[in-house]
Amino acid sequence: MGQTVTTPLSLTLDHWKDVERTAHNQSVDVKKRRWVTFCSVEWPTFNVGWPQDGTFNRDIITQVKIKVFSPGPHGHPDQVPYIVTWEALAFDPPPWVKPFVHPKPPLPPSAPSLLPEPPLSTSPRSSLYPALTPSLGAKPKPQVLPDSGGPLIDLLTEDPPPYRDPGPPPSDRDRDDGEAAPAGEAPDPSPMASRLRGRRELPVADSTTSQAFPLRSGGNGQLQYWPFSSSDLYNWKNNNPSFSEDPGKLTALIESVLLTHQPTWDDCQQLLGTLLTGEEKQRVLLEARKAVRGEDGRPTQLPNEINDAFPLERPDWDYNTQRGRNHLVLYRQLLLAGLQNAGRSPTNLAKVKGITQGPNESPSAFLERLKEAYRRYTPYDPEDPGQETNVSMSFIWQSAPDIGRKLERLEDLKSKTLGDLVREAEKIFNKRETPEEREERIKRETEEKEERRRAEDEQKEKERDRRRHREMSKLLATVVSGQKQDRQGGERRRPQLDKDQCAYCKEKGHWAKDCPKKPRGPRGPRPQTSLLALDD
């Protein structure tokens, strides 16, 4: 009384800081919302026994990891960081995980036992809850779901569901098994108590095979039914985007619900009415009816065949019969096809070109968004080998600037596959500088730039001073030379004559008064110099 059941998923959310630290030690980054989505929605659809509440069973984790790391289109590269972190928590458990990690169970016996196993006291959704010791006077809680190991049904195959036909009478061995069962065992609930589920006899499973399936059937093989709970419908509607906003994500959710819950025709209508608008539902139903194929394997236009495979009115299908179950399987397949076809938008390459890598987005996550845009806005399949070149070019051109520049400079770029480009982009992304390193680099570059600017200013000032000094020197030199010339001109004297040299003709042998070259005409009267008297 008063104790709340702790699941592996809730435990990791309560210790999220430790989970992030473990992911950091694995050189990956995880987000809480995607952690919950992968654990409770994605991984249970892998059909390896992963419960919705999570598990620390190493064998189940290994099986999920194999699915995630599958090559080609069947792999899930965006889920790699999450399963790697979960594996690290299971194989190197911190103190808060150790109570949930059980030792390996002993090897199964060589022959199956005729006595049934006693019911477990834990919840059937997950076998990894902490052991709680009940009080002596407490009554054991009845199990809501009977224990069963029936396999999940693959809706994408044409094989009939693994329901056991209740019609034939039990064999002698079945009677012996029935006699060996406890006499006080209560019969299974009515057919309206469980989701559609059958059970086939399986050999004793080894320790690596999980028996934790979400859907079960009664021990007598009678199909049981549970309608959707209002809380499930509410959570699915409020925790996912609308079909018009993100048809791929909502289609994946409905596909996982169809695979795990195997709803009836009424359940499908309730699911569509809750998750889709009226217009979206009509579009999905129309596309689903277009996908009905005739006997020749081609889409048919015959109304009777379309209404028989995908009726719009409530059909009379009994899920307790093989024929009714086959109708439901085909109906769910057509419904998935209708969701996928209705989710395709008109061709708009501008939308694809608008998908660019975020500053802190990994190349793998960016590639997934790019492929989703191709599926949604173009008629091309990005997984088609013929479209690999287009997707590769979009990946290079729309990557972050630093990654795109380095990818464009790769040697022999034409021979690189999309996987090679993603690996190179991951290397570049992981070698990026941290925000602290970037801040330090910007600070250092700013200081260097300021230092260069100061040095340039000082050099310019020195050059200006040198030019000014040179001009001043020229000016002073001009002034000094002019003064020297003036001084030399003022001190100029007549050239000296020899004793017998004529001052007029510069010839020797006579003086100027006797110079023959000097004109001898009468001299004119000298002009008298008028002197001014004081009276004047």
Swiss-Prot record:
Region Disordered, as annotated, extends over 112-196, 202-221, 432-536
InterPro entries named among the record's database cross-references: G_retro_matrix, G_retro_matrix_sf, Gag_p12, Gag_P30, Retrov_capsid_N, Retroviral_Gag-Pol_poly, Retrovr_matrix, Znf_CCHC
Q: Which GO terms describe its biological process?
A: viral budding via host ESCRT complex
- From the record, which residues define motif PTAP/PSAP motif? 109-112
Q: What segment(s) does the record annotate as region Interaction with host PIAS4?
A: 343-391
Question: What is the native source organism of this protein?
Answer: Cas-Br-E murine leukemia virus
- Biased composition regions of type Basic and acidic residues, renumbered to the chain: 432-464, 484-517
Motif segment (PPXY motif): 160-163
The reply to whether Ribosomal protein figures as a keyword in the UniProt entry is: no
Q: Where is this motif: LYPX(n)L motif?
A: 128-132
Q: What is this protein called?
A: Gag polyprotein
Domain of life, per UniProt, equals: Viruses
Q: Where is the composition biased (Pro residues)?
A: 112-121, 159-170
Segment Interaction with host UBE2I: which positions? Answer: 428-433
Locate the lipid attachment (N-myristoyl glycine): 2
According to the UniProt entry, the coiled-coil residues are 436-476
What Gene Ontology terms describe what this protein does at the molecular function level? RNA binding; structural constituent of virion; zinc ion binding
Keywords, A to Z?
Capsid protein, Coiled coil, Host cell membrane, Host cytoplasm, Host endosome, Host membrane, Host-virus interaction, Lipoprotein, Membrane, Metal-binding, Myristate, Phosphoprotein, RNA-binding, Ubl conjugation, Viral budding, Viral budding via the host ESCRT complexes, Viral matrix protein, Viral nucleoprotein, Viral release from host cell, Virion, Zinc, Zinc-finger
**What PTM annotation applies here?**
RNA-binding phosphoprotein p12 is phosphorylated on serine residues.
- Entry annotated with the keyword DNA-binding: no
